[in-house]
Amino acid sequence: MSMRKIYLISDTHFNHANIIKYCNRPFSNVEEMNKTLIKNWNNVVRDKDIVYFLGDLILSKNKAKKARELLELLNGEIVFIRGNHDKFGEKFRVIEYNGYKFMLIHNPDSSYTLNFDGWIIHGHHHANHLDEYPFINPKRKSINVSVEVINYKPVSLDLIVKLIEKGKVVRTINDL
């Protein structure tokens, strides 16, 4: 039997038209963006996999109802960490994997991260501050999994571990 994989992703902002302009996303409209994000997610994640979603799932009217409908379409067991636009989810979670300690949190500048000695996996900054918050930042021990940085699909924790072991800055997943 194959192992469950662990994936991470943040800041999908489903249904949020302005995010396309604001973050320079390569979509012409919300429908295209939503469809692509769902397709990318389901091409990567299988039903038994775990996805840590690090906040800001959806922005729309009837958000709770729309979020439930959306989640029906996405593969995997999804664990929610609350983003600044969310009303649900844990504030953060600490996990251990392959000998590393990771704090999963939406905003890396949160006071919860202050005395944490492991790696911080976060979203929130999108691709707007890549010098400070690239995909992999060994100096800060931070990992940015905002969708713009990871090419609009969930990224595996196995890949993240491989990259942090190399000890190099990786601006976006497209630089690999």
Swiss-Prot record:
Top-level lineage group: Archaea
Gene3D superfamilies: 3.60.21.10
Alphabetized InterPro entries for the sequence: Calcineurin-like_PHP_ApaH, Metallo-depent_PP-like
SUPFAM superfamilies cross-referenced by the UniProt entry: Metallo-dependent phosphatases
Annotated GO MF terms: hydrolase activity
Protein name: Uncharacterized protein MJ1445
Pfam families: Metallophos
